[in-house]
């Protein structure tokens, strides 16, 4: 276990199971049937899709992130059928960030928390001035207006469109190009979306 994982675990050491939050979860599955203990309520039918961090270390294991918003974005889905069968799927968002991490590199970039080991001064300057465009979106998901388009978001301008059925990545959208009328978008956009529609 590396130092960054040790540091993250100290924060929640009193909470049983908290350490698992900081472990890489690189397996992707599609429609795996879950074992249900007990009985689900009859009204519980539908699909729940969320996202969050799924990988903390670079593919070659040389560096790791230390903040929840920096972990590599991974979608998860629970699909509850009318007959009570529950299926689970999970898939990483296929972004430039993901491609670089999968190829063994952690791209020098501005992050929410420090990386372990820390960037050297040249890497830090490179990250601040010319680092790759941040397209990792592990914070939230939402639907664009009343369309059938869904995106994963973070506080950076890039939103990653995905198929809510297959969890496949459809591509990148910039906040300024979305059909959310009357909004000024820039790097400080908020990933916690509010709506006045139910």
Regions from the PLM with identified roles:
Residues 1-198:
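Beta-propeller domains
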């Amino acid at each position: 276990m590396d130092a960054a994982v040790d540091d993250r675990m100290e924060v929640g050491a009193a909470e049983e199971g908290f350490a698992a939050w900081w472990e890489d979860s690189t397996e992707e599955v599609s429609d795996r049937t879950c074992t249900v203990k007990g009985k689900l309520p009859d009204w519980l039918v539908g699909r729940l899709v969320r996202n969050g961090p799924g990988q903390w270390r670079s593919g070659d294991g040389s560096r790791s992130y230390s903040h929840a918003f920096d972990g590599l974005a991974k979608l998860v889905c629970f699909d509850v059928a009318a007959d009570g069968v529950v299926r689970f799927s999970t898939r990483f968002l296929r972004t430039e960030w993901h491609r670089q991490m999968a190829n063994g590199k952690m791209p020098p970039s501005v992050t929410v928390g420090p990386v372990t080991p820390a960037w050297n001064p040249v890497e830090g300057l490179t990250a601040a001035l010319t680092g790759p465009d941040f397209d990792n979106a592990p914070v939230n998901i939402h639907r664009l207006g009343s369309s059938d388009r869904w995106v994963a978001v973070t506080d950076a301008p890039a939103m990653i469109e995905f198929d809510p059925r297959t969890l496949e990545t459809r591509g990148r959208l910039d906040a300024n190009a979305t059909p959310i009328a009357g909004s000024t978008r820039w790097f400080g956009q908020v990933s916690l979306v509010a709506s006045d529609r139910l």
